[in-house]
């Protein structure tokens, strides 16, 4: 497909290098967003059926860490025990829309409950159930999304227990990730990708590099070790806050970040 786009659409003819595949195709994803629904078969927390918004309850997903399954099952048990209503897209009623989980290389997990309301009942019982399922739970966050939209996350967040971030190491740097932070799903492949990009760039230490759509600054800070100066731009305010904090955390002084539309 890439070759076809380059040759047929772009009129560019070149030899493509071999694909650098992952060492393991299993358990590599560091983030998951489970939709929640209650239908004829009861409460379902899993994934959408192809080409639909029907939620299929899943026993496991081999692309996710085992901690994700443990947290999903504990969350489902909490909803059943306290009869917490799932959000219904057709009526706009109900409370729980999604369960969001982020994990890091150290085995920690950050859970976010996406709700159609500003309050979540029985939060003490929920945090206890999640911590029992995964002792390395770092935090539990409530995201409020009152809009009738396909966008999963709303704009308002509240920490219910623990902290609202994880730290992750990438290419020898440490990054703080909040719930809305963009971070590549496959850590190991991301490191290979960034290292290859740095080789292709052939930086000498004199360049000023622009990193558009920079997210939390992962590529920017990797480039900064070899470039003279790096400027990152991103439209998401929280991501820019994270990028600036990550630069300070890693002692990078030749990178600056601006919030704005890079397009």
Language-model features and meaning:
Residues 1-158, 170, 195, 199-206:
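SAM-dependent transferase fold signal centered on methyltransferase-like domains
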Residues 122-263:
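Rossmann-like S-adenosyl-L-methionine
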């Amino acid at each position: 497909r890439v070759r076809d786009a380059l040759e047929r659409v772009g009129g560019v003819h070149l030899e493509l290098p071999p694909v650098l595949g992952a060492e393991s195709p299993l358990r590599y994803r560091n983030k998951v967003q489970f939709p929640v629904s209650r239908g004829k078969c009861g409460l379902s927390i899993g994934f959408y059926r192809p080409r639909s918004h029907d939620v299929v309850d899943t026993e496991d997903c081999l692309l996710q860490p085992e901690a994700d399954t443990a947290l999903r099952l504990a969350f489902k048990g909490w909803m059943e025990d306290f009869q917490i209503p799932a959000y219904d897209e057709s009526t706009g009623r109900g409370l729980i829309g999604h369960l969001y989980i982020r994990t890091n290389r150290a085995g920690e997990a950050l859970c976010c409950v996406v709700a159609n309301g500003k309050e979540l009942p029985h939060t003490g019982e929920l945090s206890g159930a999640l911590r029992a399922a995964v002792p390395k739970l770092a935090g539990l966050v409530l995201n409020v999304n009152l809009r009738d939209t396909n966008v999963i996350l709303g704009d308002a967040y509240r920490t219910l227990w623990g902290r609202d971030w994880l730290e992750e190491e990438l290419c020898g740097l440490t990054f703080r990730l909040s719930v809305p932070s963009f971070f590549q799903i496959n850590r190991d492949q991301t490191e290979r990708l960034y290292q290859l990009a740095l080789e292709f760039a052939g930086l000498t230490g004199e360049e000023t590099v622009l990193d558009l759509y920079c997210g939390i600054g992962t590529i920017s800070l990797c480039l900064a070790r070899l470039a003279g100066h790096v400027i990152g731009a991103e439209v998401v305010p929280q991501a820019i806050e994270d990028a600036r904090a990550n630069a300070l955390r890693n002692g990078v002084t030749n990178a600056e970040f601006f919030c704005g539309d890079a397009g």
